[in-house]
């Protein structure tokens, strides 16, 4: 299998954590790329042009980080990260909340870089920031439900928190100030799970 990836994307990191958790590193070749390069191999067969993108051993292409993560989870031998028990929907719901935070963040980051900072756009960006602040605090209020078990929701929330620290100068939110207990929880998860610690974002 081949995974087209970057070292900074929280979506890619989600997939890399799954790979590390299931010790699939020897089965997945990492192909570093930049999504915007039109002649990158992953863009030749990837209509979305996004990363991560996974090419299976059968030559089939899989798109979307959650789909790729679930596919790799199905191949793994360790504890499943997509639980099928009574907490199935709760885990997926927390994952969806983390996904919403990233959608809000990427929306205003893109607009901030592309558009002038008129009063209207500034107001729109501030609205997205305030939504993220509310959502981080919501997650902090539900730490008991999140627990310390590694699953697709908890690992993705850690990815989001670490991405906010990594891009804090652009995002403008410090999780340690906004939701300190949630931030400490994320750092503890990093210390406890090697698959998280070894995949932290960095600029290659």
Predicted features along the sequence, with ranges:
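GST-like domain detector, emphasizing the conserved glutathione-binding G-site
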Residues: 1-122
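Generic, ordered loop/turn and secondary-structure boundary motif
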Residues: 12, 62-63, 82-83, 151-156, ...
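Helix N-cap/coil-helix junction residues
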Residues: 24, 171-173, 195
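Short C-terminal domain-edge/linker segments immediately following a structured domain
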Residues: 34-36, 60-61, 84-85, 113, ...
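Non-transmembrane alpha-helical segments in soluble domains
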Residues: 69, 73, 92-95, 136, ...
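GST-like fold's C-terminal all-alpha helical module
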Residues: 98-187
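Long hydrophobic alpha-helical segments typical of transmembrane helices together
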Residues: 177-204
């Amino acid at each position: 299998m081949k995974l087209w990836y970057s070292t900074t994307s929280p979506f890619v990191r989600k997939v890399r954590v799954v790979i590390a958790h299931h010790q699939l590193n020897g089965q997945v070749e990492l192909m570093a790329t930049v999504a915007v390069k039109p002649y990158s191999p992953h863009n030749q067969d990837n209509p979305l042009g996004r990363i991560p993108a996974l090419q299976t051993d059968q030559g089939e292409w899989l798109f979307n980080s959650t789909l790729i993560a679930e596919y790799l989870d199905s191949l793994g031998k360790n504890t499943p990260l997509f639980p099928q028990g009574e907490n199935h929907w709760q885990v997926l719901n927390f994952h969806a909340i983390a996904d919403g935070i990233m959608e809000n963040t990427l929306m205003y980051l893109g607009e901030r870089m592309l558009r002038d900072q008129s009063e209207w756009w500034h107001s729109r960006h501030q609205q997205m920031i305030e939504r993220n602040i509310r959502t981080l605090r919501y997650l902090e209020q539900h730490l008991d439900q999140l627990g310390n078990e590694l699953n697709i929701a908890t690992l993705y929330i850690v990815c989001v928190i670490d991405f906010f620290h990594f891009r804090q100068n652009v995002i403008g939110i410090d999780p340690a100030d906004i939701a300190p207990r949630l931030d400490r929880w994320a750092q503890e998860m990093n210390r406890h799970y090697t698959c998280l610690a070894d995949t932290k974002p960095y600029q290659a």
